[in-house]
Every structure is written in structure tokens, then in C-alpha cells.
Amino acid sequence: TMTDDEIADLLARTLDDRRQLLKIMSMNHYDLEENSRMELLVEFKVSYGNAMKTIMAMLEKFRKDMDFEKRQEFVYSYFPFMFGIYPYTVVTKKQKEAMKLAGVDYTYSSLYNLTFVAVRRMLRN
């Protein structure tokens, strides 16, 4: 078995190593779809499906306490999270200035840290 912290660490390190992918995933999917050839879109969807299956298999192997429904619930929380995390971890100088001028008190955090905390929370629910 793996602890929640071990799984969270593994997934956080995995995402931290794939920043370019996260940047692409955070873009407007309708624009990407509109401007992509079908074979490239299919290739992406195959990879995406394989990633989902890999997470399901990891949870089945290392989290015996999670039934299929709980594993699926995790996957369908984790993957949407992945699509949106990049903009929270890479903030431009202009965005920082705009937030300051808007009076937004935003705490900047690393991709690893945000992912670790979120995954651990998802696993415990």
C-alpha cells in the first residue's frame, strides 16, 4: 500500500515535471480542438485515456480501501484539477500587478505544493 502522502507526492512530482503539458491543457479546449487535425486530437485523447487508466490502476493496487466508485470519483476530480492548475502557479508580472491594484490578496504557491495538498485532500474524501 501507499499512504495518502506518498501518492500525493508521486502525482505532484509527476505534474511538476510536465509544466509544458499543463500549460497547453489550461488553454481553451475549443480553440485547440478547432485548430487541430483529427489524428492529433485522437492521439491526445488516447494518451489522456491511458493516463486515466494508469491512475485507476495505481489506486486499485495501492489503495485497497477504495472501491471502483471511489477510484473513479478521485479520477474525475483529479483530471479537471489538472486542467486548471497551471494559471495558479505561473503568474506573470502583469497579473501580479493587476491583482495588487485590484486588492486581491493572493498567496502564490508552487505547482508541487498545490497539487500535493489537493491530491491528499481528494484521497481523504
Ranges and model annotations:
Residues F44-Y48, F74, L111, A118:
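Amphipathic alpha-helix face/heptad-repeat signature
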Residues E6, N50, T54, E69, ...:
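Short, well-structured alpha-helical interface segments that form or flank functional binding sites
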